[in-house]
């Protein structure tokens, strides 16, 4: 069992650092997870993270990259809803990193 220590509490994660229980997440934990991913969160990052959390609440699944790009484009327009923009924010993979920082399970189609 792997744990993330946050404010003196142990929070269970999987071997890749994804939270086991998404209800353990809060924005302060996102900052810690982002630091582990070597990402400094800016408002555009938060926009994607919050969007992914809402997507998860609605569909009970984390979006794979293709679905994420399409959904972001529908909500925020083509300027933000494209792979290049999302990879600039999350260089190791928008679906993978943003989902992890958002405290959600790893997307099924993520390797």
UniProtKB/Swiss-Prot annotation:
Annotated SUPFAM superfamilies: DsrC, the gamma subunit of dissimilatory sulfite reductase
Gene name in the database record: tusE
Pfam family, one: DsrC
GO cellular component entries: cytoplasm
Name this polypeptide is given: Sulfurtransferase TusE
Function of the protein: Part of a sulfur-relay system required for 2-thiolation of 5-methylaminomethyl-2-thiouridine (mnm(5)s(2)U) at tRNA wobble positions. Could accept sulfur from TusD.
A GO term for molecular function: sulfur carrier activity
A Gene Ontology BP annotation from the UniProt entry: tRNA wobble position uridine thiolation
Chief location category: cytoplasm
Alphabetical UniProt keywords: Cytoplasm, Transferase, tRNA processing
Quaternary state and interactors: Interacts with the TusBCD complex. Interacts with MnmA.
E.C. number: 2.8.1.-
Record keyword Cytoplasm present: yes
Species, as recorded: Photorhabdus laumondii subsp. laumondii (strain DSM 15139 / CIP 105565 / TT01) (Photorhabdus luminescens subsp. laumondii)
Similarity comment: family membership: Belongs to the DsrC/TusE family.
Cellular compartment(s): Cytoplasm
Residue numbers annotated as active site: 110 (cysteine persulfide intermediate)
Enzyme class: transferase
